């Protein structure tokens, strides 16, 4: 519903702005530019979708091997001690714990198609434990904020878009996204823990969060000591080595589970092809809307206004061009994806703005969509502190993304 209003607004605002330019500035080219943008944006959307087919097929094939090889179950065992402390109201050994673990593990691995049904199943289990059926319980809120914080280890789709749009190193945003999504997740956990009075100084929580924080601090310190050229070399090398290790690890996991690795890959690759075909109309719709909005001059006015406000505060404004992606992300994943593609198309995939838009896209998730779908599936209408905690995690992710992008690419 939100995306419907946003899409309509793109066209209505574009019409008003274009009409004002025609009447007051005698700009007779604005409407031809708008119409031309609808054709060029449609063509761009189709070309992107076509190019996505091969890489999506590759990675969804690899992911299917990992899924059937028991990688999600491994994540569940590793995270078990931590989540028993973050969800103290769930009885020990309750089956809903497995659904929560599997959903979060699927999200971290980028398995969106697996994550959503697992998440809905987890919500059903949490609702069974919920004494007030119309009100969100503490475990529900913690679970959903962890989802909205966008924690991910493998930002496949973003790297795929970068590759399709001609980035020199599509994986160069891999490490920045890992760092930014860590901060958004940490902020979400801390916010919910304060609301729910969860002891953050518990030994298990301190071990996990403290250890991860030290690791992230060490990574940031290390990259802060390098020259710009060294940062590019180290981050790209690490990203590619890590991704190839994941491929090898998933294949080994499949071998250990004695599955037919090749057949699993082909099965997942077919899903990748179907996914690429399915997104064509959605990508055409959002890119045409954004194209019309930009061709009318409305996008330039919006960015220029924010740019001037930022400069008045004495802050560098290079990041402003990517802000539309950050503002759209809590509302609509496809809308934010379209704005990310638009930023890379307009400024270039290897520009500061293009890279930052990708980091914004990968550092948070669609907060309002997730809350609506997950709470709606079990009939919860009173969300308590879920929205403020989710938005706080989004804000932390956006701020972290900007600072980290300046560190790596500024």
Q: Whereabouts are the PLM-identified features?
A:
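Membrane-embedded alpha-helical segments and adjacent helix-loop junctions characteristic
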Residues: 29-128, 257-346
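Hydrophobic alpha-helical segments, principally membrane-spanning helices and signal/leader peptides
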Residues: 36-39, 46, 95-97, 132-140, ...
